[in-house]
Amino acid sequence: MESPFTYILITLFFSSILLSIIFFMTWQTMGKQKYALMFSLSFLASTVLWANSLFKSLFLSHELYWMIGCSVSMLSVVLGTWGHCLRTNTKIHPATLLGIGVFGMMLTYYFTYISPHLGLRMSLYLYVDVLLLMITSVVIIKHRTKSRPAEIGASLMHFIFAMCILVAASIALSQGREMDVELIKLYAIVNFTALPAAYVGMSVFVIYMLASDLAEEMKLLAMTDPLTDCFNRRGFYSHAKQKLLELQKQPQHACLIYWDIDKFKA
């Protein structure tokens, strides 16, 4: 009988395929925004990661299997962080994110092949993932003065996901140079219970966040004139009402300008 963990990996594999397709379709239909493509590629990399774990018995070398898995894991998070930086116009150069990933790969390679150390080999790439996820969490929440509910949820889920990975990494590191069977069991419990739930939750909130972006764009479109980018009657009324409510609290005069542009458009 297959291990219960195998069924979790199969579920994550197909979930990642679906999420990658969803974000690719989002990229196609939302003006080919680069961040949507980055999200699609991120989940595609996750698909490769789960496939790598499912078919690890096909590898002739366990070290090769491990290096591929670690590299794809970091690539997935790098692409996701890159996508969030593009969405929020955060001035973090992609080379910085790639550099963090490459540095993690080099350290993992060193402690896998050159100076074998099980604890460091199993934990270093996870610490890199934690760093990138924390960057993403901050980038999302700092994007606006007043964050939308979807952004708060997405930022929180990235933070929770990072904390779950941090716990798993710390358990792996505490083994030291040699394997500790009890710690490996604890690591597996965290890795296959908390992590999948946090991963799916994070994915759903990213979709919710993009849906919220689209809703705001549609709201703006409904309140502005497409030819002049000025507020239409509905937009003027809504914006003016909000401004008047704000200015009522301040001892100063307000001036509102309203004009009819129908003849101009004709």
Spell out what each predicted region is.
Residues 17-36, 47-182, 189, 199, ...:
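Juxtamembrane segments at transmembrane-helix boundaries
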Residues 219-238, 259-265:
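Conserved nucleotide-binding and Mg2+-coordinating catalytic segments in signaling enzymes
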Residues 239-266:
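Active-site-proximal structural segments of metal-dependent nucleotidyl cyclase/transferase enzymes
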Residues 207-209, 213-220, 242, 246:
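Charged, elongated alpha-helical coiled-coil/linker "stalk" segments that transmit conformational signals
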Residues 193, 200-203, 214, 221, ...:
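Amphipathic coiled-coil signal-transmission "stalk" helices
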Residues 1-17:
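Hydrophobic transmembrane alpha-helical segments in integral membrane proteins
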